[in-house]
UniProtKB/Swiss-Prot annotation:
Region: Disordered, residue numbers: 1-105
Organism of origin: Rattus norvegicus
Basic and acidic residues compositional bias, start-end: 61-74
Subunit structure: Interacts directly with activated HRAS; a RASSF5-STK4/MST1 complex probably associates with activated HRAS. Interacts with KRAS. Probably interacts with Ras-like GTPases RRAS, MRAS, RAP1B, RAP2A and RALA. Interacts with RRAS2. Can self-associate. Interacts with RSSF1 isoform A. The RSSF1 isoform A-RSSF5 heterodimer probably mediates the association of RSSF1 with HRAS. Isoform 2 interacts with activated RAP1A and ITGAL/LFA-1. Binds STK4/MST1, inhibiting STK4/MST1 autoactivation.
Name of the molecule in the record: Ras association domain-containing protein 5
Protein keywords: Apoptosis, Cytoplasm, Cytoskeleton, Metal-binding, Microtubule, Phosphoprotein, Tumor suppressor, Zinc, Zinc-finger
Pfam families in UniProt: C1_1, Nore1-SARAH, RA
SARAH domain: residues covered: 361-408
Length: 413
């Protein structure tokens, strides 16, 4: 057998038999070829004439039995708990993304507060001006203070309070922070001024103290000395705030971009809300040797996004001596990291506490001459009232002593 030429097929290909083709004659009209039925179309929809043509006719010619129609593919059942998703056609209408500008309903798990449980009484601010816990403005003369939670406000702000009293049943319901279990408690608290007279150390002395401090530090929070003589380190501040703090409401948390660019998210809204911080919460700060108490307070308020005036708070140092806890209020110009370096890393020896500035320094330059004269008049009146009370008290003692002497003279022995 001769081999086929190059480019020709060596053997005939075995293909499926093609359906018969109908050629239109010149004399008459021939019916068009029938359409091939789809797989999923039921048998009842196929016309009899179409079924007898094409493959059906060839099957009948061979004598093969009629195959049973294959059922259409059924859709998958939807799993419980899931909604069936509908697929949009390409180019179909996309529904508009409508977002509400109105306030969403509050979480039902958050209990609504109505300012209940407070026991307000008049408070005379003799040591200096105070601060309103509701509006944040300064209180100069008369204020109202709750006997339980120490909530302080203007008399005109009393009807606007919505925060419930935290200590309705007394001071035993203080919410302790989880960190408070790590700190030993003492029975006696004595507020006493501790005077320290020390000369400023040299760079060599500071280096020796830092080496000694880092050798005793067990939590990898040592201090680092720079070439210019300054040093950096960590301090822990205990927050013992009994009065509520004011924070902005409805803002997003501070992002890394805001922290780098020093963007304050609280400045983007005028809405305010108040809440109680847990007692004895601990906050750690990384500061330098030149950081003052005023900057530490401002840094703490910025971390918690508190919008209250920094003069409302004060930083105290707490030392343990002879079984007693001694508190000393630090000046706004003191450097806490230097005190931490002198005391060592042990928090039982020295710790820092942030409290309300109840006995703040009075800025007399902020008052006018008539106001200062009014203060003098009030002080003189209070002084005279105190003198009259003491005179009346000792006059009663004198009368009782004289009566006792007269009764004893008539009795023998």
């Amino acid at each position: 057998m001769a081999s086929p030429a190059i480019g020709q097929r060596p053997y005939p290909l075995l293909l499926d038999p093609e359906p018969p083709r109908y050629l239109q004659s010149l004399g008459g009209t021939e019916p068009p070829p029938p359409a091939r039925p789809r797989r999923c179309i039921p048998t009842a929809l196929i016309s009899a004439s179409g079924a007898s043509e094409g493959r059906g006719s060839r099957r009948n010619a061979r004598g093969d039995p009629e195959p049973t129609p294959r059922d259409c593919r059924h859709a998958r059942p939807v799993r419980p708990g899931l909604q069936q998703r509908l697929r949009r056609r390409p180019g179909s209408h996309r529904p508009r993304d409508v977002r509400s500008i109105f306030e969403q309903p509050q979480d039902p798990r958050v209990l609504a507060e109505r300012g209940e449980g407070h026991r307000f009484a008049e408070l005379a601010l003799r040591g200096g001006p105070g601060w309103c816990d509701l509006c944040g403005r300064e209180v100069l003369r008369q204020a109202l203070r709750c006997a339980n939670c120490k909530f302080t406000c203007h008399p005109e702000c009393r009807s606007l309070i919505q925060l419930d009293c935290r200590q309705k049943e007394g001071p035993a319901l203080d919410r302790q922070s989880p960190e408070s279990t790590l700190t030993p408690t003492f029975n006696k608290n004595v507020c006493k001024a501790v005077e320290e007279t020390q000369h400023p150390p040299t760079i060599q002395e500071i280096k020796q103290k830092i080496d000694s401090y880092n050798s005793r530090e067990k939590h990898c929070l040592g201090m680092k000395l720079s070439e210019d003589g300054t040093y950096t380190g960590f301090i822990k501040v205990h927050l013992k705030l009994r009065r509520p703090v004011t924070v902005p409401a409805g803002i997003r948390p501070q992002s890394i971009y805001d922290a780098i660019k020093e963007v304050n998210p609280a400045a983007t809204t005028d809405k305010r809300t108040s809440f109680y911080l847990p007692l004895d919460a601990i906050k750690q700060l990384h500061i330098s040797s030149s950081t003052t108490v005023s900057e530490v307070i401002q840094g703490l308020l910025k971390k918690f996004m508190v919008v209250d005036n920094p003069q409302k708070f004060a930083l105290f140092k707490r030392i343990h001596k002879d079984g007693q806890v001694l508190f000393q209020k630090l000046s706004i110009a003191d450097c806490p990291l230097y005190l931490r370096l002198l005391a060592g890393p042990d928090t039982d020896v020295l710790s820092f506490v942030l409290k309300e500035n109840e006995t703040g320094d009075v800025e007399w330059d902020a008052f006018s001459i008539p106001e200062l004269q009014n203060f003098l008049t009030i002080l003189e009146k209070e002084e005279q009232d105190k003198i009259h009370q003491l005179q009346k008290k000792y006059n009663k003692f004198r009368q009782k002593l004289e009566e006792a002497l007269r009764e004893s003279q008539g009795k023998p022995g």
